[in-house]
Regions:
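C-terminal catalytic "cap/lid" subdomain
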Residues: 1-176
Length: 176
């Protein structure tokens, strides 16, 4: 099943009996080890029911994936990665920042290497793209080969903590 956090790291983590499809999709997009995006593909376009069990302790209960939009005002799940990389793209002052952001977004979409998270810093003309360490080199190569004017940097050895749940971005206690 899906827990509110990694039970090996958080002693108060609890099994979630129900997870909405959009929450499960976001968890999979964040590359959480508990759920892969391909698991959800057959579910999203059909009437298939999905029940998730923990491979370590399958008798401890399960999480059912429900096909309704999540409602609420905060995080239900905390997930993390201990080894992520940040690709930084410094847009030259002479370039249109919004246009550069749009171009890079299209390049990454076409290459199917969507980042876990994106930082957009208009004031510094800086774009940041967070990837797992397994994907970062590929994404960096794609951006480098695109030949966009600007400076690319790779920062390694970082960690990412993410919260998943309806309304996380609207809750000032859960989003900064």
């Amino acid at each position: 099943g899906v827990y509110s956090a990694d039970p090996r790291k958080v002693k108060d983590a609890c099994l979630l009996p129900l997870l909405r499809l959009d929450e499960a999709s976001e968890l999979a997009r964040l590359a959480a080890p508990v759920l892969h995006a391909r698991t959800l593909q057959p579910v999203s376009g059909s009437e298939i029911d999905l029940q998730l069990r923990c491979s370590y302790t399958p008798d401890q209960g399960s999480t059912r994936i429900e096909r309704v939009l999540a409602s609420g005002t905060g995080a239900r799940i905390v997930t993390s990665h201990d080894d992520v990389c940040l690709i930084e793209f410094q847009v030259p002052a002479s370039q249109d920042f919004k246009l550069a952001h749009k171009e890079i977004d299209q390049i990454l979409k076409r290459a199917q290497v969507r980042p876990l998270s994106v930082g957009v810093h208009n004031d510094r003309q800086l774009l940041q793209f967070c990837y797992t360490s397994e994907v970062a080199d590929s994404a960096l190569k794609i951006l480098d080969e695109a030949g966009l004017p600007g400076e690319l940097r790779l920062r390694q050895g970082l960690a990412l903590v993410a919260m998943v749940g309806a309304g996380v971005t609207r809750n000032p206690l859960h989003c900064h």
